[in-house]
Amino acid sequence: MTDFAARLKKVASNPEVFKQFGRGVERETLRYRQDGHLATTPHPEGLGSAFTNKWITTDFSESLLEFITPVSHDIPELMAQLKDIHHFTQTKMGEEKMWPLSMPCYVGSEDDIQLAQYGSSNSAKMKTLYREGLKRRYGSLMQIISGVHFNFSFPESFWDALYGEQDEQARQDTKSAAYFALIRNYYRFGWMIPYFFGASPALCGSFIQGRETKLPFESIGGTLYLPKATSLRLSDLGYTNSAQSVLKIGFNSIDQYLEGLGDAIRRPSEEFAKIGVKVDGEYRQLNTNILQIENELYAPIRPKRVAKSGEKPSDALSRAGVEYIEVRSLDVNPFSAVGVSEEQVRFLDLFLTWAALSDSDPMDNCELECWRDNWNKVIISGREKGLMLQIGCQGERLSLQDWAKRVFVELRQIAVEMDSAAGGDAYQAVCDKLEAWIDNPELTISGQLLELTKELGGLGKVGCALGMKFREENLAHGYQHYSQDIMETEVASSVEKQRKAEESDTLSFDEFLENYFAYLKQ
């Protein structure tokens, strides 16, 4: 019996394990007008405070909505929560719609992209200033690319099955080590996610105006596309950060990760120093380091722990270890009214469980770069038949198809156990469907989207057509988990919380920032 099979057998000995996964979704979407252009209106008043509403906030810009579900242990419940949030939001948006694609289209100039506003409290002003820094460092266009983040955790019963009873410190150390092992395997094999679910093989030509690219784009009207691409959002054209390429953040242990992250938020940047921090009495960014704050670190997956009020993410990890992981490689699913499907969630259950149960040797920076090269190949030309990927850095290669099929042998073993625990065959059905996509890349989401883009004559037309369809779908949706009263109560509560935050400030903004960044002087 392989190590993987032995670990799976241990976990499957308690079927309840598979019913207790913790899951949450964060979905971003741009508000846009009837004419297809980006909305320039403020965050809808009927949604409450973007600063304190626990379900509905904004990301980079006023027009970039972000929906956040609470942790759920049941997939239908998770999807119901997400659908209810979309329904409520759409009822407060008037004629505006939600852009159904990761890549923005009819934006106009970067000046039309207004930074998200959160009120007059020091914490709120800091959030907006952080975004001002992002704008000046990378431009606003890159920041309004939308994605879906999937938060995932294993229950205590999972760790009990694998490691038996442990005292609190030993369990904390075990979980952190295991989540970092999962993260290493995610870098090794996570290219399957953009292969199956990448949804940005094309972009509107206006998106790369003034930017150099060596990619051999073809065009449909004003749309540029790469015939075999899966996720330009994950490419150098999308949401990546070349300034961070000098950072060497390792994933072999929580200590190594925190050390690398600590260096990143303290390391000065000559390039960003040219912007200045406070010029003529106006702040331009939080500081001139490579990362203003830890959230600026670009990564396809992150180790996470819920932080206490005022606590930095790294301090939370240092205090109590890894609690869950955040998968950040999902494009918005253009064929779902809520940006992600139940099938995708089930695949992620399977894949992340497989990544945790499989062997995961330590990984140096050289090996990490080799695996990243595989990701880049899949992002740019993943639907190319017979695409060869590297196996580590030793020169061995294997086709994407052969490699994916090997992984699916073990994913199916997990699917059988998950279906046995839950009743039914939902996980095996996902394996059946996606395995057919391995040899038929035109069936992948990027393949289907590119076909529709050609059919309708451009990406903008696709976005407008799907956006209209999903607006009607979301409006027609009846509450399944929440209710109108629950949503309105959260709106009112968020407004009150923002008011209290603004009234409780005792420091000037300068003093507040001085206190917050005191750690940089230690």
Swiss-Prot record:
Q: Which residues form a coiled coil?
A: none
Q: Which InterPro entries match?
A: Gln_synth/guanido_kin_cat_dom, Glu_cys_ligase, Glut_cys_ligase
- UniProt signal peptide: none
> Which UniProt keyword terms apply here?
ATP-binding, Glutathione biosynthesis, Ligase, Nucleotide-binding
Instruction: Report whether Nucleotide-binding shows up as a keyword of the record.
Output: yes
What the record says about family reads: Belongs to the glutamate--cysteine ligase type 1 family. Type 1 subfamily.
The UniProt entry, under Pfam families, shows:
Glu_cys_ligase (PF04262)
Q: Mind listing the GO biological process terms from this record?
A: glutathione biosynthetic process
**Cellular component aspect of the GO annotation:** cytosol
Which Gene Ontology molecular function entries are recorded, alphabetically? ATP binding; glutamate-cysteine ligase activity; metal ion binding
UniProt KW Acyltransferase keyword: no
Under what name is this protein listed? Glutamate--cysteine ligase
Q: Could you say which EC number(s) this protein's record lists?
A: 6.3.2.2
Q: What gene does the UniProt entry assign to this protein?
A: gshA
